[in-house]
Amino acid sequence: NDFFFSRHNEFWRRNAEKKLPELLSATGMLACGEDLGMVPSCVPGVMAHEKILSLKMRGMEGEGEWNHLSVCATSSHDMETLRMQCDTDPQPWEVRNMLWEFLNSPSMLAIFPLQDWLALDAKLRRPYRSEERINEPADPHHHWRFRLHLDIDAIREASSLNVTICGLIKDSNRYIIK
């Protein structure tokens, strides 16, 4: 246990403090660290010091205890979509409420898979939520097989969905007029 959880913390911290500033200064991009699961205990402190956004996912530890230096998401490509995470297939109004919670979080960014946005419209989302998953790492025959069932024109022309999405974003004050 000591080998995995504490013996190498100082090693990882020193190396991160040496390498990260140079990497971060090489670009003007905002950095986000994938800090989910088993990570050395020094990681949150190093990320905060370097102003690297942490990743916050629905159902993961510390849900709802997010600060501004984070990206919140309903799921990732390796997880179940929002509809799949629920015991029963949620109605569009329930999906709206769940997305609203994320949009109202203090996280700097809120990023959702397209499947979760489409779940706001019963006619546009897939009929079976089990078909929405992008990747299932535990299944060697299910790698990256997801294909969107709509073309971009159908999404662009879905005025009700687009009005709903724009309203959620504007009402959460994540919308900036330029």
Task: Please place each PLM-identified region on the residue numbering.
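Catalytic cores of glycan-processing enzymes that make or break glycosidic bonds
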Residues: 1-178
